[in-house]
Amino acid sequence: MIQTFNELGALREQIAQWKREGLRVALVPTMGNLHGGHHSLVTLARQYADKVVASIFVNPTQFGPNEDFSRYPRTPEADVAGLEQVGCDAVWLPSVEAMYPLGVDKTTQMHAPGVSEVLEGASRPGHFDGVCTVVARLFLQVQPDVAVFGRKDYQQLAVIRQMVAELSFPIQIVGADIVRDEDGLAKSSRNQYLSAEQRPVATTIHRTLLGMREGYVAGQARDRIEADATAALQAAGFQVDYAVLRTPELAEPTFDGGGRVALIAARLGSTRLIDNLEF
């Protein structure tokens, strides 16, 4: 039976017991409102550890002033039930007061320079400071041997890898493949905001990513690939934040050849969607 923890001392006591038994512990950080993509992270975590802890915390410090913090769905009972079905061992459900005892406005903030300041960081100033701040605290609270993050948030994974390397966290970071619906739309908690009319239009993002890959393989110039992608999204009704090709490290490519990642962030109505494709 899955264990739920609302108090840090009890969670740490359980984790200490597991470690005394020589068991490896994995952490899957989430903001709740879980779907099949989140469940796949737990399944992957079980390949790397004996015990899996999922955290559920809607983190206020990673939402901007005009973003959907208050609107973000809170479904803890359904989340815990779903986690139990996929073999999660424990769920950590901290309060805002437990995570930020000095208050959200007075808390010590983390910052990962460089990779956190482009793309999502430019569109959502301060977002990755909030991500780093909460993830570092979760690492200190749970002290996992491994942590699993989805590749759908490609830049977030890169930021966390940088933070872990720089601060020498003794934690293995694992990136999980994107889980998609049959029509290609990446699973996301924000998909539920899409209307019945918008839902099929949203698949344009994945088709556009595939087109960007085709353009790159065909030898098209990066500027043309990005311009064509932006135009395709706008024609479908999106407001585009970015549609870009980058190196795996998120730098602007300076030469042909090598791996690439295509990244898109675009708004359909009031719903902002992100996706990416590595090739």
From Swiss-Prot:
The reaction proceeds by a bi uni uni bi ping pong mechanism. It is found in: Cytoplasm. ATP binds at residues 31-38, 150-153, 179, 187-190. Homodimer. Belongs to the pantothenate synthetase family. Pathway: Cofactor biosynthesis; (R)-pantothenate biosynthesis; (R)-pantothenate from (R)-pantoate and beta-alanine: step 1/1. This is Pantothenate synthetase. It is an enzyme of class 6 (ligase). GO terms for cellular component: cytosol.
